Amino acid sequence: YEMTSSLVGSEMCIRDRLPAVFHVSARALASHALSIFGDHQDVMACRQTGFALLASGSVQEAQDLAAVAHLSAIKSSIPFLHFFDGFRTSHEIQKIEALDEEELKNMVSKKSLKAFRDRALNPDAPVTRGTAQNGDVYFQAVESRNNYYNAVPDIVARYMGEISEMTGREYRPFTYYGAADAENIIVAMGSVTETIKETIDYLAKKGRKYGLVTVHLYRPFAEKYFLKVLPKTVKRIAVLDRTKEPGALGEPLYLDVKALFQGQSNSPLIIGGRYGLSSKDTTPAQIVAVYDNLELNEPKNDFTIGIVDDVTFKSLSIKSEVSIVKPGTTECKFYGLGSDGTVGANKNTIKIIGSHTQKYCQAYFDYDSKKSGGYTCSHLRFGDKPIKAPYLSLI
């Protein structure tokens, strides 16, 4: 609620095309009950505001794409909402590579920055903004902004390319991971994409070819960049949404992908599913279930993973859990009670390991919404290879 009301109160960012950037840890909206935990409901409630929406899937991406958001906002004069998964990404401790601030300064469009500053309110050059308009001109004024939004995907792609060149980490509005000739793929955004990538590698060793299209630039949704990375061999697509829109024919990302192929000949079969509401854990076995569902003669649409739905029977059945943690990775669990110091001690431990050794590290802390006295579980991983496992330890 707080984020949606804040954006509604920031309509002048849209009105005046101010290059504001909101960095948001996406969380659940209150419905039948309040939840403080993470999903994409609050972000999806803001998709009609006019803000450009940029999604990150890991701690490293959150840093890198934060820079892309600021650079693109200045260049495009469009405000950006850069979001990442609440708790799963916002509260995770990871060892990352920091960006060089001097290099970032050189990427800023000086011309666009000057133009923004020149538009500052000045009593010596008064202007009128935020007027009330009647029906004779309002519609035309709304449509006149189209060109600014049409330019955003190319601007974002440009800065993603510059960040990629600087870091060696590939960024595009949409990225593809998996077999070049995959027939069955998933489309998703957020931290679940890291789990999907690891699952694709696990299944590839068993001779199964799958793929993933990761959505980074969600708004404006750029058709040309999506189709550019989509393999020509794709026949079936499962779109995963981390939100629930009661009464709709489908969830937002699913409907966007469906609309993209509307009217095209030989378009792939597209199904949609939900996962991860209120930080519900999404494990490799659940991703395997999504790919298994795509293999069926009649795949289930409007499905859920991560729960057993014995009321409306939409959930996919999950086989035994699979462990895909890389060899050499150590996993630890520490149980405690809220305010007993267990979480704080483990935060210090993982920071010491990350700072004073060559090990990669990851820490995530699972707890309920009570204050002191509630259940806590600290999940620590460290190893010799990068750790891409945004789910609770399975040991």
Where are the language model's segments positioned?
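Peripheral docking tails and interdomain loops at the edges
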Residues: R236-V325
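Anionic-ligand anchoring segments at beta-strand to alpha-helix junctions in alpha/beta enzyme folds, i.e.
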Residues: M166, A180-D181, V187-H216, G328-L394
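Conserved thiamine diphosphate
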Residues: L34-G86, K110, G263-G276
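Single conserved hydrophobic/aromatic residue that forms the stacking wall/gate
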Residues: Y1-G9, I14
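Conformationally flexible catalytic loops at phosphate/diphosphate-handling active centers
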Residues: F80-Y176
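A structural-propensity feature for long, helix-poor, extended segments
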Residues: A33-F51, F226-E245, F365-I395
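Terminal amphipathic helices with adjacent charged low-complexity linkers/tails
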Residues: D85-D124, K228-S265, I271
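Glycine-/acidic-rich phosphate or pyrophosphate-binding loops and their flanking alpha/beta elements
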Residues: G161-N184, L316-T329
